[in-house]
Amino acid sequence: MTKSVKKNIKNEISIIVANLALSKNIKLDKININIQKPPKSDLGDISILIFELSKTLELPIATISEEIIKTLKSKYEIKAMGPYLNIKIPRKEYINNTIQMVNAQKDSYGTSKYLDNKKIILEFSSPNTNKPLHVGHLRNDAIGESLSRILKAVGAKITKINLINDRGVHICKSMLAYKKFGNCITPEKAFKKGDHLIGEFYVEYNKYSQENENAEKEIQDLLLKWEQKDKNTIELWEKLNKWAIEGIKETYKTTNISFDKIYLESEIFEIGKNVVLEGLEKGFCYKREDGAICIDLPSDSDEKAEAKAKQKVLIRSNGTSIYLTQDLGNIAIRTKEFNFDEMIYVVGSEQIQHFKNLFFVSEKLGISKNKQLIHLSHGMVNLIDGKMKSREGNVIDGDNLILELIESIMPEITQKIDNKENAKKNALNIALGAIHYYLLKSAVHKDIVFNKKESLSFTGNSGPYIQYVGARINSILEKYNALSIPIIKKINFELLKHEKEWEIIKIISELEENIIKAAKDLNPSILTNYSYSLAKHFSAYYQEVKVIDINNTDLTAARIEFLKTILQTIKNCMHLLNIPYMLKM
């Protein structure tokens, strides 16, 4: 497999550093060569930060820089600038190397062993069975699915988990409304997906509760019946949950979201109690006079529901558990089942304190020993007039958002595609590209306002624009193949002398480091930015350059291979972002 020029330079500098360390009797466990992009392209193609090496080797920056320059000056143009070494790489070698590497690796181009075999669990989505997925869920799903692909691309072993919340007060609200107003309606009779039908009853309960003081008591009575396994209550619960879960899974299929393991909260929620009782036996928890089992949170906790001593109830005096206790059980289950190294919870920012408390308690009870637990807190997706509230029905529904985008672009697509089914399939792929890209292009922690018009733009920083560029390149390649130009066995990449070709080659060569950075930062927006940059550079290049010239077949062949590397790189990014690649648009 072809090594990149950057890796060769890194290896060469590592040898120089190792020799310098040996001369000073310094033992190095690991040599970290920090390669960066120079602030200006005229300074060089790559930049090496010498400052950290200076501290490690206990040598002046100038001494290390001089040694590297002396050793490598016959191969590269190198200049020292303060704590940096700026290196210009010979274009011929760089272009040849990059194109050959992309052609050889194809779909695996950009992958690495940065997290080689690290076992990581990603928990995301975690919907309630009382409503359909809204656009906030779609953002959570987009982040979780994209990160699973990014982390897999850097060598991690990924397990995607979905914990479906199918029990509790919020589920009983839909059940109560259905009992009162359902009239035996079914999804089939209503011509609706099951999750949409159940969501309507959740909204109906909110209206009912505003007009009836006994609504809360009715909910508690229904919950008690569920806990006592009342036959009629359980049958109703199972029926409504089945409808909701079937509808939610249909949305997952539409949006290309998948899981390795799906848990139902109702099947595992009691396990956390055993974890807490074991903690009580070991003295990590204590029992209050009223029988509640508690633990003390750290002094910096913002928990306000407990006493001043930051006391946290894990099992109530009536024997019921809280949500945190159930999550303790989940950690115990997953440790036993998967023996993971790291578990990442993709959950909105409103749960920051919950996970802070969970991680503290799990460590104190010893159930997360040698395990890294991470809450990847993502921002909210808002309406123009503020935060979504599904209990009021004021929510951007995920399925309906997809349908709205499809309807917006269908008139344009049907002008190009006569077959209605093919047109609808294309429209769906564009809608998914628009949604996933828009939900991923902002940093994970930021709140966003979903703008439908902006998301569908074919000219701006959007999914459809990336899809369009991919389809445009494919069209050029098809046009070239149709010309039946004689195959040139040895392509001369030295003919690629246009400045924009050089700029694009450098961007293509940076895919691996961008994927690694996205994995390190748990931030897919790094790859949306990268994809947009590559697509923009191609568009500018294509406006200036004639790719197919039948009077210059050697240059045409070189440029066609060059376009293949651009397309492969874009396709690899689209896969990592869960954006459908389209041959035609």
Curated annotation (Swiss-Prot):
Signal peptide: none
Pfam families per record: Arg_tRNA_synt_N, DALR_1, tRNA-synt_1d
Reactions this protein catalyses: tRNA(Arg) + L-arginine + ATP = L-arginyl-tRNA(Arg) + AMP + diphosphate
Organism domain of life: Bacteria
Keyword Protein biosynthesis carried by entry: yes
Quaternary structure note: Monomer.
Protein name per its UniProtKB record: Arginine--tRNA ligase
Gene: argS
